[in-house]
Curated annotation (Swiss-Prot):
Signal peptide range: 1-17
Keywords annotated in UniProt: Antibiotic, Antimicrobial, Disulfide bond, Immunity, Innate immunity, Secreted, Signal
Domain Reelin: 18-159
Repeat keyword on record: no
Main localisation: secreted
Keyword Disulfide bond: yes
GO terms for biological process, alphabetical: defense response to bacterium; defense response to protozoan; innate immune response; negative regulation of immune response
Name of the protein in its database record: Defense protein l(2)34Fc
Domain of life, per lineage: Eukaryota
Origin species: Drosophila melanogaster (Fruit fly)
Family: Belongs to the insect defense protein family.
Disulphide-bridged cysteine pairs: 27-99
Xref: Pfam families: Reeler (PF02014)
Amino acid sequence: MFRLLVLAACLAISVHAYSDGAPKAACRDLTPQHGAKLQVTKPPYSISGPSHVRSDQKLTLTLGGDEFLGFMIQARDGQNRVVGQFQVVDSVHSQTLDCSGKDDTITHLSAQKGKPLTGITFDWIPPAGYKGNVKFMATVVQTGFVYWVGRVTKDIDVE
């Protein structure tokens, strides 16, 4: 019995959840610092919205699907650089994060086990004068032990 208690305590310590948003350590590769194994199956989530935007316009997108507790989204150019700025639409459930630039990442805020999300809407503003393809990459956390890293994507053409 004592061994089971020690094992349970060790497992509880090794899995960290970030209910107040993704940590800056996740900026580079969008990997949560949960200490659990990531999923390689097709994620039950998608990013929906227009597939093109002018460089002087704001783009509104929605991450949706099955229930989830956390997320982290970046827009990346063809050279895998994080580009553009996010604007929060739902300030109860999302916040921006400064990874390589101001407001260049959006993540969850105040995730609670009993109150999962099924969707989150956000705005993105392209860099001034930018033209080309941008890939939105999302990590979605279903539970502390179940998450998909960068597998939820959407391609956008910026004109």
